[in-house]
């Protein structure tokens, strides 16, 4: 489910994000509350992987220091799922000691990182700080989900259909199972 920060909304509208994602775009921490539920917790729990792209220096600092003052910073703090960040910022911001320490802390906490790349930046400069290409981010997401799980290499036999148990040579007990679930 996409979450758009106030800064991100300066570049693209929530409506555009919703249209591209075919999902509701969330922008406000408190607009999620329905029937007394904690919306940010719901978002954090119903995901399999939290992907933050682009991850600004501000958001990285909030994540590294446990600051949760908006939906984008609260969700990764509230999740127990893996987090993947794709940093994007000015070269000087990327190379700043504070940013490097924040990224090191996040990586030590198990946050995965892709990028940033070297290349053209928004301020007509070139250098490290460019967000990884969307195709590379997608490849990292696919790699995450294609990791072998606890059942990798195991084989299973699935049987389906009715169960018939003989009582004697003439009578039996059976159920009306069609087997459709087993064939699905």
Where are these regions (language model features)?
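A cross-family phosphate/adenosyl-ligand binding-site feature
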Residues: 1-83, 91-179, 183
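G-domain G4 guanine-recognition motif of GTPases
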Residues: 88
